[in-house]
């Protein structure tokens, strides 16, 4: 599978029509075999300006974010909700990606229409423990 602008463009209309203003695309393609399950978290996220990603943290995993098109701002917070860091990530720019440490509250703000990020996390998805909102 090519992770190209044609793929991104095919997801963009779904993101634009979504009430959330974004759409993820699961990149796990491995077929589960007896005794083995693909527990990775790898996805594309196509974002539109104005999408709101709630401030959250991942208590059990770090998160890698790499911009594949457009630009986003990754914002880190302390446990009281005060901003501690801001980083503009831009495709083709001096800083296209970031590693969000485990347990750090953060959000991602879309800066350009049709921005696309790649996200990966260390641990399997667990809906009861994966995110903790501020």
Predicted regions and their residues:
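A short, N-terminal "cap"/entry segment at the start of jelly-roll beta-barrel domains
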Residues: 1-39, 85-91
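Double-stranded beta-helix
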Residues: 10-11, 82-88, 105-134
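Conserved short histidine dyad/triad with adjacent acidic residue
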Residues: 43-60
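Glycine- and acidic-residue-biased ligand/ion/polar-headgroup-sensing regions
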Residues: 60-80
């Amino acid at each position: 599978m090519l992770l190209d602008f044609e793929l991104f463009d095919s997801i963009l209309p779904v993101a634009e029509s979504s009430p959330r203003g974004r759409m993820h695309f699961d990149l796990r393609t491995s077929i589960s075999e007896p005794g083995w399950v693909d527990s990775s978290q790898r996805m594309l996220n196509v974002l539109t300006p104005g999408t709101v990603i709630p401030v959250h943290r991942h208590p059990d995993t770090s998160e890698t974010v790499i911009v594949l098109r457009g630009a986003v701002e990754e914002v880190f917070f302390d446990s009281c909700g005060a901003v501690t860091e801001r980083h503009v990530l831009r495709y083709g720019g001096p800083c296209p990606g970031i590693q969000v440490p485990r347990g750090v509250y953060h959000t991602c703000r879309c800066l350009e229409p049709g921005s696309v990020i790649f996200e990966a996390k260390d641990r399997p998805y667990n809906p009861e423990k994966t995110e903790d909102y501020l």
